[in-house]
């Protein structure tokens, strides 16, 4: 569990991790959990994905976000969908995950509408590759 103390409201928040974080990941979360914006500059393999997902879950639990956009390199973005999200987001958080693809099918269009729709109390996660921004 991570206990965070907000200096503005002196509220203690509790978050139950799905996967146990290392100390440096806890330290990063303590620095970013209540910020409007932040960046994670860390070496490859240090758990930036876990930090980002845990932070998104903390914000979701606090009612600060209801959607998450993940932009990753083409060779890595499907790893978020196939492995990382289910590995790190706690099971008690209901979520809807959609990966970007170049498709005109009616089913995919309906899924896109769902991701963009009003909040139905699920964390909506849209994952895309950075190269798609240039197409």
Regions found by a protein language model. Give the residues of each.
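SF2 helicase/translocase NTPase motor core
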Residues: 2-40, 46-135
């Amino acid at each position: 569990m991570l206990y965070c103390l907000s200096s503005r409201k002196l509220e203690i928040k509790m978050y139950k991790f799905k996967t146990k974080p290392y100390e440096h990941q806890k330290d990063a979360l303590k620095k970013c959990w209540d910020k409007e914006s932040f960046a994670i500059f860390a070496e490859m393999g240090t758990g930036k994905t876990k930090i980002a997902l845990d932070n998104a879950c903390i914000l979701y639990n606090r009612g600060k976000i209801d959607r998450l956009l993940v932009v990753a390199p083409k060779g890595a973005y499907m790893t978020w969908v196939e492995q990382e999200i289910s590995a790190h987001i706690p099971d008690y958080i209901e979520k809807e995950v959609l990966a970007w693809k170049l498709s005109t099918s009616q089913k995919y269009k309906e899924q896109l509408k769902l991701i963009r729709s009003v909040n139905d109390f699920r964390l909506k996660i849209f994952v895309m590759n950075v190269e798609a921004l240039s197409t």
